Amino acid sequence: METKPNALTGTSLSSTSGQTTQKSITLQNSENKYIPQNSSETFGLMAILNLALLLWTLLATLRVTLQKNWPTETTKTTTITQFTTLQKNTPSAKNGLKNTTNKHSHEDM
């Protein structure tokens, strides 16, 4: 009796005097861990892994986008400093809030 194992399909073919029989065996690796037997089990596992990877990628992209566009404390401080400097350099601030638009007042006439 000659037995030829087939590792791809999990079956072995035995032949005795022209008759061929097929026996199904359970696929296991060297550590005796379970190997899925049909495509639906593999598909379910792959679907879960793909969804996890997609979610991870989306969250990483969102985090990077928010970090680029989110105003930091340094940005806020710089903006406030620039605004304060701008207020100090305006003519009305220099002249004590006097009206500087009219060169001649009514008193000069």
Swiss-Prot record:
- Bias (Low complexity) ranges: 8-22
The record's Gene Ontology cellular component field reads: host cell membrane; membrane
Instruction: Provide the residue span(s) of the region labelled Disordered.
Output: 1-25, 84-109
UniProt entry keywords in alphabetical sequence: Host membrane, Membrane, Transmembrane, Transmembrane helix
Polar residues composition bias: which ranges? 91-102
Q: Which residues cross the membrane?
A: 42-62
In the bilayer, the protein is annotated as: Single-pass membrane protein
Q: What is its main location?
A: host cell
State its location(s).
Host membrane
Q: What is this protein called?
A: Uncharacterized protein N
The species this protein was found in: Bdellovibrio phage phiMH2K
